[in-house]
Amino acid sequence: MANDWKKTARGQALEVLEEVFQEGAYSNIALNAHLSKSHLTDKDKALVTEIVYGTVARKITLEWILAHVIEDRDKLEAWVYDLLLLSLYQLAYLDKIPAHAVVNDAVSIAKNRGNKKGAEKLVNAVLRKLSSQPLPDPSKIKRVNKRYSVQYSLPVWLVKKLIDQYGEDRALAIFQSLFVRNKASVRVTDVSRMEEIADATGAERSELSPVGLVKSSGYFAGTEYFKEGLLTIQDETSQLVAPTLGIQGEEEILDACAAPGGKTVHMASYLTSGHVTALDLYDHKLDLIKENAQRLGLADKVKTQKLDASQVHRVFPADSFDKILVDAPCSGIGLIRRKPDIKYNKDLQDFASLKAVQLDILSSVCQTLRKGGIITYSTCTIIAEENQEVIQAFLETHPDFEQVALDHPCQNIMVNGCLAITPEQYLTDGFFIAQLRKKA
C-alpha cells in the first residue's frame, strides 16, 4: 500500500524531520509525539530516535557532503532532500547498518511517497554513489572557522564566537564534546539513601553535585525510587543552583523564571516554615511546577503565580523576599548536546536582545529584595554576553548591590567568583551561576 512507508522506522523518522526542518518543530517534541502513537517495536523506536537526533545534530556536515553530489538542491522537493539527509546520516555514522538496507529502504520510501518516478531514481543514484566511494573529508577545508563548522555541524558565527571567547584549543574541546552521548542524571532527595539507590540503579555519584547520580544509559523515571519521590530528574549543573542560596528554612524565596520546577522544588526541600513563590508566563508550565511539588511532597512549600518576571516590582512590594533565584531566559547554547536544534535557531543578534531581557528581570526583582538578601543568577548558556557581562552591567547601574564570590570543590569551574561550566569539562550541560547581595 502507498502509505506503508509511514509505518517503517525510517518513514517515521522522515515525517519527524520534515516537521523539524520544514515547519520549525522542536525535534524532541515532534519525536515524542510520533513515538507515542507508533506501533513500532522498541528496537525500531530506538532507530527512529537515533536517526532523528543524529540527522539534526549533524545537519551542516550532511548538507556539505550532499552538496558534492547534488548539483541544484533547490530543484528537489523538501521531503526528498530530508530523505537523503537521514539516509546519509546512517551511511556515514551508523556502521552497524548495512549500506544496502539504507539504500533499499530510502528507494522504497521515495517510490511510495513520490508522485513522480524521478524521485525514486534520484534517491537511488545519489545514495548508491555515496555508499560506493569514500565520503568527502571536511578536515581538508582550509579556512579554520568553515572547517570546524562543517566538522562539528555548527554555524560559522557560533564557531567564531566560541573561539573568540575561549581560544581555539578549548573551543575545539567544546565542539568535540557535543557529540558525546548525554548522560542520564537525577537528584537524590534523601541523601542518606544515596549509596543504596546508586547500587540499585547502576548509577555513579556525580563529580559535580553531592546529591547527584548519573549513568550513561537507562531510565531513572521508571524506577520505584522515582515514583516514591526519592529521585527527581535534574541535570548535574542545575543541581548546583539551590545550594548557593544557603537556605536556612524560614525564608520567603522568589523563583522568578521557575518552569518546569526542578530548582523550585530543590529550594523548597530546604524549607521549614518558609515558601517559594514560583512564577511563569504560562498556565501549563505552572501546572508542571505544581505536579513536581506534589510528587515530592512539597506542595505546601510552593506557591505559583502567572507573571512576567520583568513585572515583579509592579506586583510585589519592596522587602517581599529574603532570597531570589533568576534562572534567566537565555540562548540555551549550553544545551546543544541534548537539544541540537538550538544551534540552528539562534543568531549573533540574539545575545544583545537576551541580555536586555535578563537585565530587565534583574532590575525588576531586585526592588522586592530585603536588605542583606541575595539573588542567584543562573543560565544554561556559555556565552559571556548573557553571563559575566549581565552581572557587570547590573552592578554598574545598581550601586546598592555587590557580587558574592561563590565556591565549589571543582576549582576548574570557578571564574571570578562565578561557576562557569562548559560542556567538555564534565560532559554536562554548559551552565553559569553568579550571586549578588543587596547591601545592608
Residue ranges and their predicted role:
Residues 1-440:
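S-adenosylmethionine
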